[in-house]
Every structure is written in structure tokens, then in C-alpha cells.
Amino acid sequence: MKHSYRADEPLWLNYTEAISKTWDIDPTYNAIHGAMKDMGEAKTHRVLAGMALYYHLGFSCQLAEQSTDENFWDVLGNNYEGTKRGTERRYFRGEQGRASLKYIKDNYKTPTDFLLGLHRDKYSDLLKAFGPVPAFGPYFVWKMGDIYDRILGMPIQADNCIEHLPSEPFKGMELVRKEMIARGDASFADYTPQQMFEYMESQTNKLGLIAPPAGDRLLDIREIETAMCGLKHFYTGTDYVGKDLVKHSESLLGYGETADLLRSHMPPVIARDYFMAPASVIKLHGPNRKIDEEGSNPIVKTTGLGSFFR
């Protein structure tokens, strides 16, 4: 089964629908949420604390497996230098990272204390709670909000989110604006960021797209943020629908039984051609790309990045 491009929908909405229906939008949430019952609360919290600091799912599982609540911070510190970091935590090194570990260890005895002690009901209050914690700027507080709301079932009201979004989704948002203007709606030129995100949320809601992993609500600004981060790379040919499913599934290989358990709950990998848009549509975006048109199946080539639309 493939997701067919629908010309009556803008490309950004086709893309968002495709990553939503395949759970490619946030597959790690499905994996952790699905394994929680078997892991138990304490180990789940160790996995999540590891993710908060290193953002590498495989290592976080290994760490949770080889530590206890009592020695977790020490084990984390002892493996500080050589531990893999996820791309999002590539700068969590040197004195900045050590200062963060020290602060957390000094203030929270266990990973459970850390997670539950910093939770707040509103995103604006969550930002304040994490304010004193080194290496937890707006981007990772946003990630923590996802951990609470989507994985732990501890809802967070998304108040004032637009004011604190990381910079990356705004780049995707501007591509949506350009696309909608190109489709003939000049009014998008005057939309504020708030109006843009409200528009995108309303369009995904009309399609009934649900938020992973529990599917307990429709997509909102938090999932739209994720989609916008991916959309920029999709338009420039460095991403494809299903890429995160592959990446995060592979990140669990070779990290022990807990990682294998999470991998068993990862959404299934899909074919690279699950969603393909006509070259004539893609040509509207990413002016630096070379497009080889072959019917409705374009091969988009970006220097040094390979071909992702095929």
C-alpha cells in the first residue's frame, strides 16, 4: 500500500498525512510507549532520562539495562566521554554537559525524581522549571514536553508555544507559505506565524490525523512542528517519507535486550517509494535541485546527497 499524491491538497499536507499515517512523524514515541508495560516504570524513566541527556535511543536502552535507579547518574557520568550522542545532542560535551549532569545529580536522586520533579501542566511553566538546568534550552524543553505529553501520558497545555518554538520549523513554515502563494492564495503573504500554524493544524484536523503514539487526540502544533522540520529536508531532497523509521530502528541494533524490546514496538519500515510527488509539483520547491522527470516518478538529485525521490 502506498500513499498516492492528491493534487487537490498542497504538497505539505500530502507529506504530513503520509508521515502521520505511517507513524514516521515520531516513531521513537511508539517504541518507548509500546514497551513501557514490559519495562516497568523505573526502567522506562531511566530510558527517558538517558534520551533527555544523550538523545541516542540505543545507548539509553543499554544504560537503563546496566544501571539501577541508585547508581544511574554515576553510570552516566562514567560513560560520559565515549558515549554516542544523537544529532540533537551533538554539543552535549565538555564542561557544559558535565555541568548539566552535576546539576541534575545534585538535585534529583533518581531518573524518576528528575522527570516527575520538573513536570508542569503548562508549556510556559515547563520552560521556567527547566530554566536553571544547564544544557536545557528551548529546543530540549520542547523535547521534554513531548516526553511528558506523548509517552508518559502527563498532558501539557501548549500555551504560548509559538513564542518558544525552535528555529527549524519556521523554515518549513515559510516553505508552506510560498507553496500556498504559488497555488494562487496571495493572502498567505500576510499571515503571521501564529496564523500559519493555526492554518496547518486546521487542515490536518480536517483529515482526522491523530497524534502518536496513543492516537488520543488530533495533531496539534507539537506534531506540526515535527512535520515542518522534516518538510524542509523533504523539499530539498535530503529526506523521504519513512527515513526516520529506518534510522531509529537501526539505532537500536546491538544495544541489548531492552533495545530489542523497543525495536519490536517500532512501527514497520516502509518502502522508499511509499509516497512520491510529481516532478512538476516538486519543481516549485528547492530551486537548487536537479530533477529528472520520468512520468510521475521524479528522481531528485542533490549534489553529495544521493537520490531520495525514486
From Swiss-Prot:
Keywords: Host-virus interaction, Inhibition of host innate immune response by virus, Restriction-modification system evasion by virus, Transferase, Viral immunoevasion. GO terms for biological process: symbiont-mediated evasion of host restriction-modification system; symbiont-mediated suppression of host innate immune response. GO terms for molecular function: transferase activity. Pfam families: ADDT (PF18724). It catalyses: 5-phosphomethyl-dUMP in DNA + putrescine = 5-N(alpha)-putrescinyl-dTMP in DNA + phosphate. InterPro entries: ADDT. Belongs to the thymidine aminotransferase family. Mutant am37 contains a normal amount of thymine, no alpha-putrescinylthymine, and hydroxymethyluracil. Mutants am36 and am42 contain more thymine and less a-putrescinylthymine than wild-type. Transfers putrescine to 5-phosphomethyl-2'-deoxyuridine (5-PmdU) to produce 5-Nalpha-putrescinylthymidine (Nalpha-PutT) as a step in the pathway leading to thymidine hypermodifications in the viral genome. As a final result of the pathway of hypermodification, Nalpha-PutT substitutes for about 50% of thymidines in the viral DNA. These modifications probably prevent degradation of viral genome by the host restriction-modification antiviral defense system. This is Putrescinyltransferase.
